[in-house]
A protein has these predicted regions:
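Negatively charged, low-complexity tracts enriched in Asp/Glu with abundant Ser/Thr
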Residues: 1-39, 122-128
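Acidic, low-complexity, intrinsically disordered interaction modules
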Residues: 41-122
Length: 131
């Protein structure tokens, strides 16, 4: 048997070109999140996009989540952004012991509205239609 055999490799793509472009817009819309939290979103070619989170020098990233559709990526990054904002609001207070929902309920109504309206801002930046 010859050792010079050629193997045909077929590269399967797990994300469509359209979704790749949409995901790029979502990743760009949430750029401020990457500065606030130890999160990095990367285009990994035919595999889609990955969110790397919770970095430690000894072990690298604890969480790696792969996205192949822009809507789930948008919703996940929205929740990360909101949770980060709520954490920052509660930091240094007894509220930090509460869950994110409870922290949100403790906020003044105007602040709640302001936070929720930010989702529409991100959606517009990412060219995503909210449902």
């Amino acid at each position: 048997m010859s050792r010079n055999r050629r193997f045909a490799t077929v590269e399967k793509s797990y994300i469509t070109d359209i979704e790749r472009e949409r995901c790029k817009k979502v990743a760009a819309a949430y750029a401020e999140l990457y500065e606030l939290e130890s999160i990095l979103v990367l285009d990994v070619g035919r595999y889609g996009f990955v969110k790397l989170q919770y970095y430690t020098p000894e072990y690298g990233f604890n969480d790696v989540i792969t996205y192949t559709d822009s809507e789930s990526m948008f919703e996940d990054l929205w929740q990360e952004w909101l949770d980060t904002r709520l954490y920052l609001f509660a930091k240094g207070t007894p509220m930090l012991e509460m869950g994110y929902e409870e922290i949100f309920k403790c906020l003044p109504e105007e602040k709640q509205k302001e936070l929720l309206e930010q989702k529409a801002v991100f959606a517009k930046m990412a060219e995503i239609e909210l449902k």
